Amino acid sequence: MERLIEKLLYSSRWIMAPIYLGLSLLLLALGIKFFQEIFHLLPNIFTIKEVDLILVALSLIDVSLVGGLIVMVMFSGYENFVSKLDVDESEDKLGWLGKLDTSSLKNKVSASIVAISSIHLLKVFMNTENIESDKIKWYLLLHITFVVSAFAMGYLDKITKK
């Protein structure tokens, strides 16, 4: 009975595989949104104000960072929790593939969240005349929370490895 339960528990990790596959669909949706922004920008490129162009650029950078975060979670999550990715050794193989354990993934995810939050906060600061000051304070507080959390997780990781 114990062996059966253990086999079932171990096999249940495959339930995560469709979730990681679903993240690739989310990545596709992000790519579509990215190019939608580009196509909206191009007809107005000669008339758009510099501040608005920078805001669009920051939005596109934000999408790019989120996409990278999705790729990182998708690949390393699959490798850590489901099965080893059997990708042939080639020039285009990701250097970190197979090397991210859950602890380093957690640190990279928190660093990515801080970077995404920083970009978002920069967009807010560039558009302060259209945003209420209370909202700006909340954005700033949330960003500080992300930064402190990332440092705390890194510190806890460091002291647990000693």
UniProtKB/Swiss-Prot annotation:
One annotated Gene Ontology cellular component of this protein: plasma membrane
Compartments where located: Cell membrane
Chief subcellular location: membrane
Bilayer topology term: Multi-pass membrane protein
Entry superkingdom: Bacteria
Keywords: Cell membrane, Membrane, Transmembrane, Transmembrane helix
Bilayer-spanning residue ranges: 10-32, 53-75, 109-126, 139-156
Signal peptide positions (record): none
PANTHER family linked: UPF0114 PROTEIN YQHA
Protein name stated in the entry: UPF0114 protein VC_0208
